[in-house]
Amino acid sequence: MERQNDTQQKVFSGLFWRFLERGGSQIVTLLVTIILQRLLEPTMYGTVSKVTVITAILLVFVDSGMANALIQKKDPDDLDFSSVFYFNIFFCLLLYLALFLLSPWLSVVFREPGLTPVLRVLGLTLIVAGLKNVQEAYVKKTMQFKRFFFATLGGTLFSGALGIVLALRGFGVWALVAQQLSNAAVNTAILWLTIPWRPKRMFSWWRLQGLLSYGWKLLVASLIDQGYQKIYLIITGILQGNAEMAFFEKGQNWPNLLMDSVNTTMDSVLLPALSAEQERKERLRSMTRRAIQIGSFVIMPLLAGFAACATPLVRLLVTEKWLPTVPYLRIFCVIYAFYPMHLANLNAIKALGRSDMFLLLEIVKRGLELVILLCTVRHGAYVMALGLLGSELASQGINAWPNGRLIDYSYWKQLKDIAPILLLSLLMAACVYGLSFLALPDALILLIQIMLGIGIYAGGARLLKLDSFDYLIGTIRNLMLKKKAG
């Protein structure tokens, strides 16, 4: 019982600080993005998008397998952390060298002559990531998520200010490059200043092999996932140009800002928490169920409401030149609404040490999605996005399937748990969407939509006595009472 309470306390603390970090940084990022989108043309965003597609795929090699292996391992020590750190640095230098040499060829592939210097400068984020990766794993393993708050917020504020100043001074594409690179650099510097762990002068190839045996499967799975996600942007950029690529990317990024605050919080805190309970299947099932319910309760209404008021919101914040973003934005709102299910199921599988199952699921999902992509690619970016929506909904069931056997929590049980939340979110969105057609200023329409949406969802949750609503209210009350008692 004492162990359970200790785990619960760490989870609550981790969730609080991680959500505060992600929420704060996403608010700042959103404000900076709005300002930059008003200052810069969609074609400039398209150029930088091509670079971030490439670096995002390469960052998978740094961010995925080995860090997760350290977190999943029962009792990693300094030898484990130091071995992974030195391996990462060496590997990141090799990746950057390859990117530096291949930049001219990639410029030809993307039909963008000026891409070479942008690739070579923004590619430095690979080296920065190598310095940060093990520090992040250490924070997650020890569940000291308060450390992330200062690092992320500091990096976001500094890089946002720098990007805006450079954009105002006419630096164009380089304003976006400086923003992204400085964000990574400042974030990493603050982590190094605030975290006591330092790499020791020790290295064990034997220890590294043990971590690789678990981590390489997650690495391949993440590489397949990231490559598949980015291929839509690559195809859109090559076939339909920078502007359409920017509309597609921003349609994806705006819902992602909302989703990321909750899902990154869950993803960071859940894996170490579930790994600590990997030998107690009943406890693991209970925590997975709670994560799906709470995540869905928060994310679904946010994204449903966002999709419903997308047109007046985009027009008000970033002007009419970005209205072609709206159809993509609505599609990605639906996709991301179900991500708490994806993450909770996958984290349960990882916590049990079943990286082989994780990789198998990724291969099956991406195989299905590749078939859908091949069928939709000739019809343009919008039809491709609809195909992505269909494949992501199918992936829900695929991700949930193993947990019916592993922890006795089937896909059908999961759907029953979130059904009231989904239906209430859809009802709220339908009511909010109807207000978009009022002959009123956009700001006033949005204000009415937000107030009505909150009223319908909160009132409906209370009326239906949703378990997630009662749980959140109870948790907040307990935390406040503990704070007063302390």
Please place each PLM-identified region on the residue numbering.
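Hydrophobic alpha-helical transmembrane segments
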Residues: 116-123, 151-196, 210-214, 247-252, ...
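N-terminal membrane topogenesis motif
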Residues: 1-30, 68-71, 75-86, 115, ...
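Membrane-proximal transmembrane or re-entrant/amphipathic helices at the cytosolic face
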Residues: 2-3, 401-404, 409-411, 418, ...
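Transmembrane helical elements of multi-pass membrane transporters/channels
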Residues: 14-29, 155, 176-179, 183, ...
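Helix-loop junctions and terminal segments of transmembrane helices
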Residues: 29, 61-78, 140-141, 199, ...
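Membrane-interface junctions at transmembrane-helix termini in multi-pass inner-membrane proteins
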Residues: 8-12, 69-78, 128-151, 165, ...
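Interhelical loop/hinge segments that connect adjacent transmembrane helices in multipass membrane
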Residues: 1-7, 11, 146, 189-234, ...
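Signature of the first transmembrane helix
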Residues: 7-66, 90-103, 120, 125, ...
